[in-house]
Amino acid sequence: QAVFSHETALFFHDLTDREPLKYTITVRTGYNPSRLQEDGFQVYTVKKDLHEIGIIAMQTSFGHSVPVYDMERTICDLLRSRKNIEMQVFQDALKQYAKRKDKNLRMLMKYAAMFHVEKILRPYLEVLL
């Protein structure tokens, strides 16, 4: 139901060295996030058909398997929410992503088109790659 996203997903993927002050999760539209917000989570909502895209399982430091959005989805989510995040965090994460051997630029551009951030993402990538 809830998927770790945004700054929290960056931390899971080692794309930032900032441990999130608040864990960030994404739920599908229609889900009542008030309990999660009361528990201290920052909650984003997304349409049901976009919610499942890019979910992978990752291990916490305690060995628990949790749902997290993949790196490519996380980058697109950050751009979609750019009014709510520090752009420096995004730029640093994108620089780290560009250095990774396991990056998938084809998938990143596919997601960027699906999430309508392609025109915003492209200039950043042209500088980095």
What residue ranges belong to the model's regions?
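Nucleic-acid-binding surface
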Residues: 1-129
